[in-house]
Amino acid sequence: FFARVAPTLAEFQDAIASARDSSAAPGGVLRVTTGAAFGRHYVVPLIPAFQRQYPGVRLEISMNDNMVDLIRDGFDVAIRGGTIADSSLITRRVCTLAMVYVASPAYLKKFGTPKTPEDLVNHQIIALRFLSGAISQWDFRVRGKAVAFEATQPTLTLSDTGMVGDAAVAGMGVTRMALHFAWPHLQAGRLKLVLMPYNDPGAREMVIHYPHREHVAPRVKAFVDFMLASLEDEPSLHATLKDAAPYAA
């Protein structure tokens, strides 16, 4: 019973708070969920500035790659990657999540540069395992058709999206990762792009979403607006494949 009435009660409480505090600074507890790697790299570094601007807001941030139900799990805001099609949520786009294939210059010097997806069978592969247990599929476009590569025997398998890039920088093999995570490594020369003519970047997006309510709590609006403005100014989140082309091996 409580699970059914909790969202309605929360909406009622937020409406009262919004009406009462419309002229006051945002305050109260704000519960946020985000992916582990994205949270470490992009969300947490922005928190000091947010709290200086909104000292009355107390943040609780959960960083993991679990599947999250915003309402059921009691979160106010989610910052997540994927395709969001829930009409009960307000969705605000942060950036496109283009995927790329990378390896370190040292690895490529030792093992050579893969020229086609078929070459990957002769390379060390750094794979990502989802919480479901499945290994992330690598997608390519070959002669206009979608082709999937599945690493049956990866050299290294990790469950953290940020760590696959660190492993690639360490020269442990070829991996697939989001361009925004690869961007600083590409600029610094720690990674090179491979298989660019065949790369399928995907169609996923990083979004901020929160419950669709008539009265959005001031603390929610303040946090969402602050994050959108701050992340808009982060170059790595808006780098394109065209921008990345000079970093190809």
Q: Model features per residue range: what roles?
A:
Residues 1-11:
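Basic, amphipathic "hinge/linker" alpha-helix immediately C-terminal to the N-terminal HTH DNA-binding motif
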Residues 10-33:
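Short helix-loop hinge/linker segments at domain boundaries
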Residues 27-90, 239-249:
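Central regulatory/effector-binding core of bacterial HTH transcription factors
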Residues 56, 183-184, 188, 198-249:
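C-terminal effector-binding regulatory domain of bacterial HTH transcription factors
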Residues 59-63, 149-160:
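Short beta-strand-to-loop elements that line the ligand-binding cleft
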Residues 88-128:
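Flexible hinge/capping segments at coil-to-helix
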Residues 126-144:
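Secondary-structure junction motif
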Residues 167-190:
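A ligand-binding cleft/hinge motif common to bilobed small-molecule-binding domains
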